[in-house]
């Protein structure tokens, strides 16, 4: 019984120490005007954004955050349309990926086409990325023109506006907190990613 108690005390102390390391204004910001109705964990990104590429493909922060989330907590990712000549079309394409449930297939291919090979220059090129990912052109076209995708595009636009988004990558928790990307432990990539995920899970417990 004593060992069980000591173990519980250790867990509580460990959580307290971790929580004490996270400070409003350093690792996160509390929004002046919280937005209700937003996803519990919401990330904004753009396929045009070099930092988003590093965030996703090199550091793999979204993957780490998703893995660390408590059971039943969902992470949502929205594309922004204010970057690049095809920003609006890529936001529509991301809505298609969301509707078809192929976000993980599309993400690396689209980043590669937009930033590395620069082969995504037209709406047709965007469509070809989906075909490369195994989605038929017909399915892509049908989804692109669907009510579901139009609604998802509107959701992405409204969330960015309501949260007064100014740049990407950006992650919000419960429509109330924004993670400060520059407030994490930068002593190593692993430490940065772990602390980022820890801050998100910590904020999920805050009222």
UniProtKB/Swiss-Prot annotation:
Residues 20-149 form the Thioredoxin domain. GO terms for molecular function: protein disulfide isomerase activity; protein-disulfide reductase activity. InterPro entries: DSBA-like_thioredoxin_dom, DsbA/DsbL, Thiol_disulfide_DsbA, Thioredoxin-like_sf, Thioredoxin_CS, Thioredoxin_domain. It comes from the Bacteria. Disulfide bonds join 49-52. Residues 1-19 form the signal peptide. GO terms for biological process: cellular response to antibiotic. Keywords: Disulfide bond, Periplasm, Redox-active center, Signal. It is found in: Periplasm. The keyword Repeat does not apply. Pfam families: DSBA (PF01323). The keyword Signal applies. GO terms for cellular component: outer membrane-bounded periplasmic space. Required for disulfide bond formation in some periplasmic proteins such as PhoA or OmpA. Acts by transferring its disulfide bond to other proteins and is reduced in the process. DsbA is reoxidized by DsbB. It is required for pilus biogenesis. Belongs to the thioredoxin family. DsbA subfamily. This is Thiol:disulfide interchange protein DsbA.
């Amino acid at each position: 019984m004593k060992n069980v108690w000591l173990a519980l005390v250790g867990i509580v102390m460990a959580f307290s120490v971790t929580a004490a390391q996270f400070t409003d204004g350093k690792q996160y910001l509390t929004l002046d005007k919280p937005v209700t109705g937003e996803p519990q964990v919401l990330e904004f990104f753009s396929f045009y954004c070099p930092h988003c590429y590093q965030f996703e493909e090199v550091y793999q922060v979204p993957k780490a955050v998703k893995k660390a989330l408590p059971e039943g907590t969902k992470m949502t990712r929205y594309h922004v349309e204010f970057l690049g000549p095809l920003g609006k079309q890529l936001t529509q394409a991301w809505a298609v990926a969301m509707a078809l449930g192929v976000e993980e297939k599309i993400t690396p291919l689209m980043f590669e086409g937009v930033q590395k090979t620069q082969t995504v220059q037209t709406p047709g090129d965007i469509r070809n990325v989906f075909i490369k990912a195994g989605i038929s052109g017909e399915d892509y076209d049908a989804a692109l023109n669907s009510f579901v995708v139009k609604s998802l595009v509107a959701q992405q636009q409204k969330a960015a506006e309501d949260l007064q988004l100014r740049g990407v990558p950006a992650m919000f928790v419960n429509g109330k907190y924004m993670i400060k990307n520059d407030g994490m432990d930068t002593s190593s990539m692993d430490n940065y990613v772990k602390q980022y995920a820890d801050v998100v899970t910590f904020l999920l417990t805050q009222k």
